[in-house]
Amino acid sequence: MKYDHLLVRYGELTLKGSNRKKFVNQLRNNVNKSLKGLDGFVVKGKRDRMYIELEDHADINEITYRLSKIFGIKSISPVLKVEKTIEAMSAAAIKFAQQFEENSTFKIDVKRADKNFPMDTYELQRELGGAILKHFDNISVNVKRPDHEIRVEVRLDAIYMYEEVVPGSGGLPVGTGGKTLLMLSGGIDSPVAGMEVMRRGVTIEAIHFHSPPFTSDQAKEKVIELTRILAERVGPIKLHIVPFTELQKQVNKVVHPRYTMTSTRRMMMRVADKLVHQIGALAIVNGENLGQVASQTLHSMYAINNVTSTPVLRPLLTYDKEEIIIKSKEIGTFETSIQPFEDCCTIFTPKNPVTEPNFDKVVQYESVFDFEEMINRAVENIETLEITSDYKTIKEQQTNQLINDFL
């Protein structure tokens, strides 16, 4: 079947009332960005849905795949745009039926957005079903459990006919909900947390704490790859890599061993808080899950949060670990997340970390050294990378450079 349009259904944009135009415009921009590099199509965004007009050479499968990854899109259907005559509709219905298997069953489903169309829903179903049955003697109607369902939408401008409905990612268009800073560790949880807030229309930049030589270049490349996977859905993402060795060593030098984990995370939050103000973000996002590890109890979260007045969003707070793993696999980050490269959260881990840290104690331990200068130095020396969906890792770049130098 040669389709001439893609019908794109909006997600929660239908609930946005007077703000809908803003959301539709943002979604159109996101669609154009996602489809960059492809040709043979024209994007037409309307108030209640979007149409992608296809030329003969358009790569419909690639376009549909990319659209399915965009937040704010509920579903996509390859459609035939048909004139508003029963003759044109019947001819299109027969085209669909030509693709059916022998002895298969079908159903006609009609929706009439144009209530002035001269035929009602039942009449259209009967006429189109009858046209198919007259043309083929080896297929039949089954309205309850059909093998095929030809869907017909009668709209003001034309008739749209289709069979397939490809699920989209739902949610809201990224860019409509402000900016946040994602604390990206390299584990399973934080990429999922990032994906969850992006699904609510939020733009993200990511921050990663790197502690060489205790953490390797492979750990850094792992985080770059996770960012690249997230960028496949939303376009380029800035990744801020913080040199954290000095701070982490100093924490382990002056803080009681049972409190080093709490204090380390407080230092991370202080660095993140400064960066939030530099980039104009409105919140910090992390992958914390209540009770999962010692640093993620309510007592720990209270002690860690206390260093910032910036809102901290925890999309995975109440998830089961298995739920997070399932989502990680769905979004394509799981296999990268489980690569066995240590991050700064796993080095210097005390044997018996405190699970209910006393806030006054952690402040007392940290008070013996003025960390502010180290924190400012870490922020000043942040390495910022812009990660795109086709970003090459450091190793790949070095290999390509060696090849070019050799040639």
Curated annotation (Swiss-Prot):
Ranges annotated as spanning the membrane: none
InterPro entries, sorted: Rossmann-like_a/b/a_fold (IPR014729), ThiI_AANH (IPR020536), ThiI_fer (IPR054173), ThiI_N (IPR049961), THUMP_dom (IPR004114), THUMP_ThiI (IPR049962), tRNA_STrfase (IPR003720), tRNA_sulfurtransferase_ThiI (IPR050102)
GO molecular function (one): CCA tRNA nucleotidyltransferase activity
One Pfam family it belongs to: ThiI
Major location category of this protein: cytoplasm
CDD domains in alphabetical order: PPase_ThiI (cd01712), THUMP_ThiI (cd11716)
Broad EC category: transferase
Compartments reported by the entry: Cytoplasm
Keyword ATP-binding: yes
EC number, UniProt record: 2.8.1.4
RNA-binding keyword on record: yes
Functional pathway: Cofactor biosynthesis; thiamine diphosphate biosynthesis
Segments forming domain THUMP: 61-165
Binding site for ATP: M183, L184, H208, F209, R265, G287, Q296
Catalytic activity: [ThiI sulfur-carrier protein]-S-sulfanyl-L-cysteine + a uridine in tRNA + 2 reduced [2Fe-2S]-[ferredoxin] + ATP + H(+) = [ThiI sulfur-carrier protein]-L-cysteine + a 4-thiouridine in tRNA + 2 oxidized [2Fe-2S]-[ferredoxin] + AMP + diphosphate; [ThiS sulfur-carrier protein]-C-terminal Gly-Gly-AMP + S-sulfanyl-L-cysteinyl-[cysteine desulfurase] + AH2 = [ThiS sulfur-carrier protein]-C-terminal-Gly-aminoethanethioate + L-cysteinyl-[cysteine desulfurase] + A + AMP + 2 H(+)
Alphabetized PROSITE patterns for the sequence: THUMP
GO cellular component, one term: cytosol
Listed SUPFAM superfamilies: Adenine nucleotide alpha hydrolases-like, THUMP domain-like
GO BP of this protein: thiamine biosynthetic process; thiamine diphosphate biosynthetic process; thiazole biosynthetic process; tRNA 4-thiouridine biosynthesis
Family: Belongs to the ThiI family.
Known role: Catalyzes the ATP-dependent transfer of a sulfur to tRNA to produce 4-thiouridine in position 8 of tRNAs, which functions as a near-UV photosensor. Also catalyzes the transfer of sulfur to the sulfur carrier protein ThiS, forming ThiS-thiocarboxylate. This is a step in the synthesis of thiazole, in the thiamine biosynthesis pathway. The sulfur is donated as persulfide by IscS.
Protein name: Probable tRNA sulfurtransferase
Source organism per UniProt: Staphylococcus aureus (strain MSSA476)
